[in-house]
Amino acid sequence: MLVVIMFFIAFVFCSWLSYSYLCPYISTKELNKSR
């Protein structure tokens, strides 16, 4: 059970890290496209 919890935490952390890394890139790309 502990392994499942650790795997879930790692998955959430990785997804949050990738989201926080890609969000500004996507927003700046959208801004450049609209400009």
UniProtKB/Swiss-Prot annotation:
Virion surface topological domain: 23-35
Keyword field contains Kinase: no
GO (cellular component) term, any one: viral envelope
Spans traversing the lipid bilayer: 2-22
Superkingdom: Viruses
Expression induction: Expressed in the intermediate phase of the viral replicative cycle.
Main location, first listed in the record: virion
PTM info: Unglycosylated because produced in viral factories instead of the classic ER -Golgi route.
Membrane-topology annotation of the record: Single-pass membrane protein
Location of the protein in the cell: Virion membrane
Keywords, ordered alphabetically: Membrane, Transmembrane, Transmembrane helix, Viral envelope protein, Viral penetration into host cytoplasm, Virion, Virus entry into host cell
One biological process term in Gene Ontology: symbiont entry into host cell
Subunit relationships: Component of the entry fusion complex (EFC) composed of OPG053, OPG076, OPG086, OPG094, OPG095, OPG099, OPG107, OPG143, OPG104, OPG147 and OPG155. Except for OPG095 and OPG053, each of the EFC proteins is required for assembly or stability of the complex.
Family: Belongs to the orthopoxvirus OPG076 family.
Function: Component of the entry fusion complex (EFC), which consists of 11 proteins. During cell infection, this complex mediates entry of the virion core into the host cytoplasm by a two-step mechanism consisting of lipid mixing of the viral and cellular membranes and subsequent pore formation.
Protein name: Entry-fusion complex protein OPG076
Upper classification of the organism: Viruses, Varidnaviria, Bamfordvirae, Nucleocytoviricota, Pokkesviricetes
